[in-house]
Amino acid sequence: TSGTDNTAMGSGALDALTTGGSNTGLGRAALGSTTTGGSNTAVGRSALSTNSTGDSNTAVGRGALQASTTASGNTAVGKDALLANTTGSGNIGIGLDAGTAITTGNQNIAIGNEALLATTTNSGNTAVGYIALQDNTADHNTAVGGQALLQNTTGTRNVAVGSFSLDANTTASENTAVGYAALSANTTGANNTSV
């Protein structure tokens, strides 16, 4: 191997490294498949374990970014955070199962246990709060607050700020709800504003 400035601790950590540099793998199989990827940090069993050429990823927690192969610029903190991400880049998942199903989606932010739980290939979503945007399979939604936009599936360009705001919304788009339980009964109505 000609890689430099790498640190590995744990069975199988950084096991496949050839030329990658500035990687840190702590835990069983952490960064275990990395060959040429660089500037990655993996702490926890199987964190970033299938990463091969991805750069500048941070994974802290068992299974964090486990399926990532060539993705870059992701941050996952928490057990199984961004677990299924393979090639999606620029994602942030903080919390148990945060963004766990994202595979190829980009620029998603999931902060809170099970935030963005169902999102897979979608991009540009922000979910902050316990199970915020949990059922989401659409792009460009913003939910801040516990259970905000909880049931949203295909609705796009919605903004929900406050716990339970727009939590029953499923397919409606371009709604803005600010405040506790704002527009919480709305399911399919579009272009509504409640402040």
Segments (PLM) and residue ranges:
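Glycine- and small/polar-enriched repetitive beta-structure motifs of secreted/surface proteins
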Residues: 1-195
